[in-house]
Swiss-Prot record:
It comes from Ralstonia nicotianae (strain ATCC BAA-1114 / GMI1000) (Ralstonia solanacearum). It is found in: Cytoplasm. Residues 219-254 form the UVR domain. NCBIfam families: PRK00558.1-5, uvrC. Interacts with UvrB in an incision complex. Its main location: cytoplasm. InterPro entries: GIY-YIG_endonuc, GIY-YIG_endonuc_sf, GIY-YIG_UvrC_Cho, Hlx-hairpin-Hlx_DNA-bd_motif, RuvA_2-like, UVR_dom, UVR_dom_sf, UvrABC_protein_C. This is UvrABC system protein C. Keywords: Cytoplasm, DNA damage, DNA excision, DNA repair, Excision nuclease, SOS response.
Length: 654
């Protein structure tokens, strides 16, 4: 019996001319144990990743069924190699399966894009805790509330807490160095603990009430505030009673405006609804945290029809012996919706927060999936298929949201594909698959020659590809020389492409857009000729009169006459979209680089100030401006700064 984790050798590249894959011999060697299997084609590319409670039974089902759908039969015909990994349990198989799906993106699996982590609202561990937006790994040091479906949902909750409880949002360095209240105190959004305008005890109570509100204990918080108001009134402290009364009024307004879960029910709930149309799908995830509906987020899977057909085979093969099953049409929308929902739950929650309750639009049949989620969460996870009351209303909202998001997505895809086609025709690119049109666009950004940066943004598959964007720090040029900057970035980018071509792994775009006119295009042409690349790929985007959108001119490096497309051109709309994204990406990087240089460079120039001392100074005085405003005596109070060094710092900065 193979031990857990045992796996077959990696997939070799198989010559298609060799004998067909001997499935029978391979299946005979498989164990009847839980595990994960991978199918590979003759080129070694992964076709499908699946899990099984019985590897032998599952894999053999693909090769013994006589009524396979055309899509499954097509995949099976491509199988040239199988790898398997034995695990200890079905839960382990589920986890490994979804990790492999995310890593390998197989052609026949339903895939959801691995989104960045969800945002949280954080209350810091401080004598006067700070309320902050947070995205990333959580720890036990601070309090985290969420996750939230979007940054907007976090900031909306922060605005509510600022209005009702007036918690601070400033950085600790700012808090430690304030001598008078900020504007937020004047507009009644902060109680100014920085200048002791509120006692530590009262501020702690406000923090506790805010946390209770976020955790869904709205009635308890309301009662606490009412008791506090009555105590102030009984003590004839009418001004304080009026302040608490205003808090109660603001909180009542919030609770009236938002749908709140009934008392006694779980206050953290996710609502999942699936919509399908024309081979496309949307999963709409609505989040309820602390009994409050925070909004929703739409997810759009790929490989929908191929993946759903094969998932159906997997589910049927995994039914225990003796259990009755009803055959379903491979393209049945209800079955596809269930398969898509199960794929989303598996891929989404196995590394995310799992709420106690999932309200779903379709049943979840996958054996062991909910058990695995419960084991991960360390508590019971309930799945509600036919909710009542507020949950029913939330599910109906989520279902409508899924339908609207899918309709909008299909409409956007149609218009974006039309723009891609128009650009290809305008520039003269001949492609059978428009999704393969790869466009790279370059822009240079600086302020009077300072902090020069170049950006490269990428467009393909009818969309901007943020994960492939690159920034380049431009060095060793005359400040403000945009031509030299463009030469440097193009040489650095496409020298790498030339080197990759020698290894048969080029990543060459079909169009290279340059934000500039004839001068910039001429520089690009020289670089491409030096590297032996096709200058026909180069297109400059020259700004029109008054820099108005729609008046741009396309400038070609290969001698073709310049082209003015006009404001109504679909091709120009796409060019402008890509060019503007390159400009945005470059300018944000340039600003960050410039700010960093201005905040640290003057301290770096002072002898005796290393990284640690510089960090202590900036933290103590809240930035370079605070350091410059400090006296010699104040500078000398910082750890590691002697009286002599403090005098030198003061002299250098003044």
């Amino acid at each position: 019996m193979p031990p857990p984790g045992a796996q077959t050798p990696p997939a070799p590249a198989v010559d298609p001319s060799e004998a067909a894959f001997d499935a029978k011999a391979h299946i005979a060697r498989l164990p009847s144990l839980p595990g994960v299997y991978r199918y590979f084609d003759a080129q070694g590319s992964v076709l499908y990743v699946g899990k099984a409670r019985d590897l032998k039974k599952r894999v053999s089902s693909y090769f013994t069924k006589t009524l396979l759908s055309p899509r499954i039969a097509m995949m099976v015909a491509k199988i040239a190699h199988i790898e398997t990994t034995v695990v200890r349990s079905e839960a382990e198989a589920l986890l490994l399966e979804n990790n492999l799906i995310k890593a390998l993106a197989p052609r026949y699996n339903i895939l959801f894009r691995d989104d960045k982590s969800y945002p949280y609202l954080k209350l810091t561990q401080h004598a006067y805790p700070r309320m902050a937006y947070y995205r990333g790994a959580t720890d036990r040091k601070h309090q985290y509330f969420g996750p939230f479906p979007s940054a907007h949902a976090v900031r909306e909750s922060m605005q509510i807490l600022q209005k009702v409880f007036q918690l601070r949002t400033c950085e600790d360095t700012v808090f430690n160095n304030r001598t008078r209240p900020c504007l937020l105190h004047q507009i009644h959004r902060c109680t100014a603990p920085c200048v002791q305008a509120i006692s530590a005890e009262d501020y702690a109570r406000d923090v506790a009430n805010a946390a209770g509100f976020l955790l869904g204990r709205q009635d308890e918080v309301m009662q606490t505030l009412q008791d506090k108001m009555q105590r102030h009134a009984a003590a004839l402290e009418f001004e304080q009673a009026a302040t608490v009364r205003d808090q109660i009024g603001a909180l009542s307004t919030v609770l009236t405006r938002q749908s709140v879960e009934e008392v006694g029910q779980a206050s953290d709930i996710d609502i999942l609804a699936v919509a399908i149309k024309g081979g496309h799908a949307c999963v709409n995830l609505a989040m309820v945290r602390g009994g409050r509906h925070l909004g929703d987020k739409a997810y759009f899977p790929t490989h929908v029809e191929e993946g759903a057909a094969i998932v159906g085979v997997d589910v049927e093969a995994d039914v225990p012996e003796g259990a009755e099953t009803q055959p379903e049409p491979a393209r049945d929308p209800e079955r596809m919706a269930r398969d898509i929902l199960e794929a989303f739950v598996a891929q989404h929650y196995l590394d995310q927060f799992v709420p106690p309750v999932l309200v779903v639009s379709h049943p979840i049949r996958a054996a062991g999936l909910i058990e695995a989620l419960a084991a991960q969460a360390g508590r019971r996870v309930s799945v509600v298929r036919q909710p009542q009351g507020a949950r029913r209303a939330w599910l109906e909202m989520a279902e409508k949201g899924a339908e609207l998001s899918l309709a909008r997505r299909l409409s956007e895809q149609g218009s974006q594909q039309a723009r891609t086609r128009a650009l290809a025709e305008t520039i003269g690119v001949d492609l059978e698959d428009l999704a393969a049109l790869r466009v790279e666009c370059f822009d240079i950004s600086h302020t009077a020659g300072e902090a020069t940066q170049a950006s490269c943004v990428v467009f393909h598959s009818h969309a901007m590809q943020n994960g492939e964007y690159r920034r380049y720090n431009i060095q060793d040029i005359i400040p403000g020389d945009d031509y030299a900057a463009m030469r440097q970035v193009l040489t650095r980018r496409y020298q790498k492409v030339v080197e990759q071509a020698a290894e048969d792994a080029p990543d060459m775009p079909r169009v290279v857009l340059i934000d500039g006119g004839k001068g910039q295009v001429e520089v690009a042409r020289q670089v491409f000729e030096e590297l032996g690349l096709d200058i026909g790929l180069l297109v400059g985007v020259a700004k029109g009169e008054g820099r108005k959108v729609g008046l741009e001119t396309l400038v070609f490096a290969d001698g073709r006459p310049s082209l003015e497309l006009g404001q109504g051109s679909a091709a120009l709309m796409l060019v402008a979209q890509i060019r503007d994204e390159a400009h945005r990406f470059a300018i944000t990087g340039m600003r960050a680089k410039r700010a960093k240089a201005r905040n640290t460079s003057r301290l770096e120039e002072i002898e005796g100030i290393g990284a640690k001392r510089r960090q202590r100074l900036l933290a103590r005085f809240g930035g370079l401006r605070g350091v410059m405003a400090a006296s010699v005596e104040e500078l000398a109070t910082v750890e590691g700064i002697s009286q002599t060094l403090a005098e030198e710092i003061y002299r250098q900065l003044h």
